[in-house]
């Protein structure tokens, strides 16, 4: 995520001014303050890695990402390469369920797979996403975990593959929410903070 992309999405959708709608999806705990404290802009790009470096912040964030879905019957957590692997696996352990990987591009991924090409993201890029067909079944209720959601195009592609496998969509839980109210409702997005709450890029760091 870049500072330019953040400004572009804010200007196009206006969704980040819809405080009353946005607040309904926000979780409150120590994780929110820790995420805001450790977030940085580096070269105009969002850097959430410092959150992961701090064990207390990481534990708080993982707990908050899992929190709204503890009693939701989730049977598997899904994560998109690459930060989704880190966060998704941690949330899966927190919930006591297994992890399902979604890979990008042409990396080695054995077995029969489903493939989706996402709609363009905030940079205009379309990602090819792949899911092992055997990883999700009709009895599964799948939660997607990621660090940031902007257009929701990749999350929507993952939902399509999960449902093609016969699985059920539990929702999407992220650290930073930058999507529109309509897409937020469609995907069942829960977040720790919104993009509007992040410190502004100073144009130098």
Give, region by region, the residue ranges found by the protein language model:
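PRPP-dependent phosphoribosyltransferase catalytic core
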Residues: 2, 6, 15-19, 23-31, ...
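Active-site-facing substrate-recognition patch
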Residues: 15-74
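Short glycine-rich phosphate-binding loop at a beta-alpha junction
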Residues: 74-81
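Gly/Ser/Thr-rich loops at beta-strand to alpha-helix junctions
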Residues: 81-86, 151
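Short, ordered loop/turn segments at secondary-structure junctions
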Residues: 82, 104-107, 175-178
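Short Gly/Thr/Asp-enriched flexible loops that form oxyanion-binding sites at enzyme active sites
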Residues: 86-95, 158-159
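Short, glycine/charge-rich flexible loops or terminal/linker lids adjacent to PRPP-binding catalytic cores
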Residues: 97-142
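Acidic, divalent-metal-coordinating active-site segment for phosphoryl/phosphodiester hydrolysis
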Residues: 146-156
């Amino acid at each position: 995520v870049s500072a330019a992309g953040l400004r572009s999405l804010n200007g196009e959708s206006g969704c980040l001014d819809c405080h009353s709608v946005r607040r309904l999806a926000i979780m409150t705990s120590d994780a929110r303050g820790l995420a805001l404290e450790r977030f940085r802009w580096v070269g105009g790009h969002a850097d959430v890695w410092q959150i992961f470096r701090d064990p207390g912040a990481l534990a708080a964030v993982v707990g908050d990402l899992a929190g709204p879905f503890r009693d939701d019957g989730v049977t598997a957590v899904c994560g998109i390469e690459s930060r989704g692997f880190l966060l998704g696996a941690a949330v899966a352990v927190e919930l006591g369920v297994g992890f399902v990987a979604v890979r990008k591009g042409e990396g080695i991924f054995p077995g029969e797979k489903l493939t989706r090409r996402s709609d363009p993201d905030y940079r205009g890029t379309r990602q090819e996403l792949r899911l092992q067909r055997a990883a999700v079944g009709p009895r599964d209720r799948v939660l997607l975990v990621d660090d940031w959601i902007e257009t929701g195009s990749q999350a929507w592609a993952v939902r399509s593959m999960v449902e093609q496998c016969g699985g059920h969509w539990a929702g999407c839980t992220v650290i930073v929410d930058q999507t529109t109210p309509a897409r937020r409702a469609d995907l069942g997005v829960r977040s720790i903070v919104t993009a509007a709450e992040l410190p502004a890029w100073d144009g130098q760091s």
